[in-house]
UniProtKB/Swiss-Prot annotation:
UniProt keyword ATP-binding, yes or no: yes
Binding-site positions, ATP: 426-433
Protein name: DEAD-box ATP-dependent RNA helicase 26
Similarity comment: family membership: Belongs to the DEAD box helicase family.
Length: 850
């Protein structure tokens, strides 16, 4: 009768060593067996404690010399006497004491590291043999990466490291011990020991073949090499940084090779193969859908929740609502949750406010040689070094490519440096941001350092911007100017990010300069502990785009902010226009002896002076086809086209973007219903790209600098004359030429009387090919019904706010239903009764309710 034993029982074999014969050599891998103490066989721990086991040589070069193993890897094997019980107990005691200080990593050595017995001993004790040394490339890090010059020795994952003594523990993954991770689901699964040990032993149904180079074979459940932990059903060989997700055919090797459909593959050099959604490289970049970094946290599943810290940059983990957004490729834009319902959607907008990332965002402001030649109208001959600025600031200005000042900077800087308040009227796109940032930085430099006892250092400069895009752009430019001022920090607080995240960031990072939008700044004043106290240290207050701040209804918030900062301060108001509302706020914000600087001379053209302007009048049912024809003609004439299309509302913006996407155009969209991180990414992509179309609402109308925009199309009625001018100002920036087209319906033509003084001419309609009409109709039929319904409702609400049109509500509803038919709908969508009540359109004929 056969006996059955539990799976956990292991028979105790004799302790006498087995002499190996020459015929037992296995080739490349030579296993040296020795006597195993009796207590170790009875000890209740399993493969994770392999300190008593033999060292395994994973050599791929068996012909190299191996001094330490030479005496026991020969044909004769190893002969030694059995150990006594006392020796066993002594060895066990030493091993247990090692448990307290070591990370329990399996001890295996690389052949190249075995040349010297002393080196071998030191490498085994400190677990330094993780990869082959790299010849003349300098001291290699733990995984074979060459250390770079005097940038500081790097540990195995790129963080600064000092030379350890042999007695110190050599931890990895942010000094997390392997023993701390035993609580995760990697490990024993349903009674199986799938610990992917360094002995190369495989569990049941597991083909362990993860090699020292991280190779991954077809249908191989490999025990991930180095630190890769093997999950159930994981085809993984992810080494160094590769994440091991379930059912992922991964093979991210030591050089970052990546198979298709790999969601990790973050390579040592940061290379990305197709369908790879990551690439967090050694330089600290964090691309979308990557939650990997330099530290592996204990108990993390599939390596989620990993953060990284490089050169002081702290990337927070994205929250779940951003995960859905990250799955949306920019080439195929889907609808995302509105900001109204998920205002705290994510925190991934931080890269734009970090010094390492700011240079890219600001390079568009560099006056290149071409700019200098074509933009004499706004550049002066005055150099920055003619003013008493910090040498480090001047060095950063030179690195940024600025040589001479703009007219705005030349006019405002001397007065501001004298300590006076300033109201400056200037053309859009002429360097207003640098004009107020440079003197603000000088104010920070001259301020006495905060006392060491102060837990919350004061905020010295407060910049208030009307939109998130403007705030992010201003913060990026500030970081560029602060390139050689490492002790001065810039933080940005804007809607669309979590309030606790911003609170944490301001507490842990330097924040002498704060850039904010009014609503979020008010939130911090009311809800952040100690924030109001920090604002009492403000010495410089800047209101950027002051006219726009007031147009957006922020007057009460601005008054609240002004009351929260000291009266003894210096204040700058910069604006493209100075209407009566701005003059009124001047009495509250500025001192009586403030200077008004008008950089727009009478008779000189505005930014749009070199922009060819035209308008077209067509019925609503022809607008979409007409837009398609205009775009096709412009693309045919301009290889490096860059087009911005402005729409009346966010939902109409989404509709137009969906339509153009169906027509196979390279299109992106930005509007208030998109999460802030999405808007930041798309804005940055559009800024750097060519041959691209951006469909946007008025969030991109002011101040945002997109270089080389060749065409601006405005679909529908602008809210007013100033909005038309600001939209048009996205092209023709910095002296370059551009083109603007305003597309109106016949009943919107009254708007032209407000811009009759501008050089805008009426253009005949281009011929529309019937085939183009069919393509547009087909594209509209493929747009989701919910998007059409939302666009109809938003369109109705927008034109209800236009007094000239909203006077006759019956006529307004007829026009809305005409817009509905232009989208290809037979009948207008139903609108909830409560929404109609808020619009003031209850019981109006022609509306359907639900």
């Amino acid at each position: 009768m056969s006996s059955k034993f539990p799976l956990g029982v292991r028979f105790i074999t004799h302790s006498l060593p087995c002499t190996r014969l020459a015929s037992m050599n296995s080739g490349a891998l030579i296993y040296s067996f020795r006597s195993v103490p009796v207590l170790s066989k009875a000890f209740p721990f399993r493969l994770k404690y392999i300190g008593l086991g033999s060292r395994v040589n994973f050599s791929t070069r068996p012909e190299r010399s191996q001094p330490e193993f030479a005496r026991r890897s020969g044909a004769g094997g190893e002969i030694r006497a059995s150990k006594s019980l006392i020796e066993d107990e002594a060895e066990l005691s030493d091993w247990v004491s090692d448990l307290r200080t070591s990370s329990l990593r399996g001890k295996f050595t690389s052949d190249e590291d075995n040349a010297d017995p002393e080196v071998v001993r030191r490498n085994v004790d400190r677990d330094t043999s993780r990869g082959p040394r790299r010849g003349r490339e300098g001291q290699s890090d733990r995984f074979g990466g060459a250390k770079r010059g005097k940038e500081g020795e790097m540990d195995r994952f790129g963080s600064p490291n000092r030379r350890r003594t042999s007695g110190e523990p050599a931890d990895s993954f942010g000094n997390k011990r392997l023993g701390d991770r035993e609580g995760s689901r990697n490990g024993r699964v349903q009674g199986k020991s799938s610990e992917s040990s360094f002995r190369g032993r495989s569990d049941r149904n597991v083909d362990s073949g993860s090699s020292f180079r991280g190779r991954s074979d077809k249908n191989v459940d490999s025990g991930s090499s180095f630190r890769g932990r093997n999950d159930r059903n994981v085809d993984s060989g992810s080494s160094f940084r590769g994440r091991s997700d379930r059912n992922v055919d991964s093979g991210s090797s030591f050089r970052g090779r990546s198979d298709r459909n790999v969601d990790s593959g973050s390579s040592f050099r940061g290379r990305n193969d197709r369908n790879v959604d990551s690439g967090s490289s050694f330089r600290g970049r964090n691309d979308r859908n990557v939650e990997s970094g330099f530290r592996r946290e204990p108990g993390s599943e599939n390596n989620r929740g990993l953060g990284k810290q490089t050169r002081g940059l702290s990337l927070e983990e994205e929250d779940s609502s951003d995960d859905d957004e990250n799955r949306v490729g920019l080439g195929n834009i889907d609808d995302l949750p509105s900001e109204d319902s998920s205002d705290e959607d994510d925190e991934n907008d931080e890269p734009l406010i970090k010094k390492a990332a700011s240079a890219k965002a600001v390079q568009t402001d560099k006056p290149t040689g071409e700019h200098v030649k074509t933009s004499d109208s706004y550049l002066s001959k005055t150099r920055f070094d003619q003013f008493p600025l910090s040498p480090l600031s001047l060095k950063a200005i030179k690195d940024a490519g600025f040589e001479t000042m703009t007219v705005v900077q030349e006019a405002t800087l001397p007065i501001i440096l004298q300590g006076k308040d300033v109201l400056a009227k200037a053309k859009t796109g002429t360097g207003k941001t640098v004009a107020f940032l440079l003197p603000a930085i000088e104010a920070v430099i001259k301020s006495p350092p905060a006392s060491r006892d102060s837990r919350q250092p004061p905020i010295i400069v407060l910049v208030v911007c009307p939109t998130r895009e403007l705030a992010s752009q201003a913060a990026a430019e500030a970081n560029t100017l602060l390139k050689y001022h490492p002790s001065i920090g810039v933080q940005v607080v804007i809607g669309g990010t979590k309030l606790p995240t911003e609170q944490r960031r301001m507490q842990t990072n330097p924040c002498q300069i704060l850039v904010a939008t009014p609503g979020r700044l008010k939130d911090h004043i009311e809800n952040t502990s100690g924030f109001a106290t920090r604002l009492m240290g403000v010495k410089v207050l800047v209101l950027d785009e002051a006219d726009h701040l007031l147009d957006m209804g922020f007057r009460r918030d601005i008054e609240r902010i002004i009351a929260a900062v000291p009266k003894q301060r210096q204040t700058f108001l910069f604006s493209a226009t100075v209407p009566e509302e701005v003059r009124q706020i001047c009495h509250v914000a500025l001192k009586r002896d403030h200077e008004f600087i008008n950089c727009v001379q009478e008779g000189s053209g505005e930014t749009h002076q070199k922009v060819t302007q035209m308008y077209m009048i067509a019925s609503l049912d022809r607008h979409f086809s007409l837009l398609h024809v205009l775009l096709k003609e412009h693309i045919a004439d301009n290889v490096d086209y860059k087009v911005i299309i402005f729409c009346t509302t966010a939902m109409v913006t989404r509709l137009v973007a969906d339509l153009l996407s169906q027509l196979s155009l390279n299109v992106r969209e930005i509007h208030s219903r998109k999460p802030q991180s999405y808007r930041t990414r798309v804005s940055d992509e559009f800024r750097k790209s060519k041959a691209i179309i951006l469909v946007t609402s008025d969030v991109s109308a002011r101040g945002v600098d997109y270089p080389d925009v060749s065409l601006v199309v405005q679909m529908g009625l602008p809210s007013d004359r100033e909005q038309y001018i600001h939209r048009l100002g996205r092209t023709g920036r910095k002296g370059k030429e551009g083109e603007g087209v305003l597309l109106l319906a016949p009943w919107e033509e009254y708007f032209m009387s407000s811009v009759k003084d501008l050089p805008i001419t009426k253009s005949p309609l281009p011929p529309i090919d019937p085939e183009a009409v069919k393509r547009v109709q087909k594209g509209l039929s493929q747009v989701e019904m919910k998007n059409k319904e939302a666009a109809y409702q938003a369109w109705l609400g927008y034109y209800k706010s236009q007094k000239m049109i909203a006077r006759d509500t019956t006529r307004l509803v007829e026009l809305a239903n005409e817009f509905s038919r232009s989208m290809g709908l037979d009948s207008p969508p139903a609108i909830p009764k409560n929404v109609l009540g808020k619009m003031g359109l209850k019981n109006v004929p022609g509306l359907r309710t639900k």
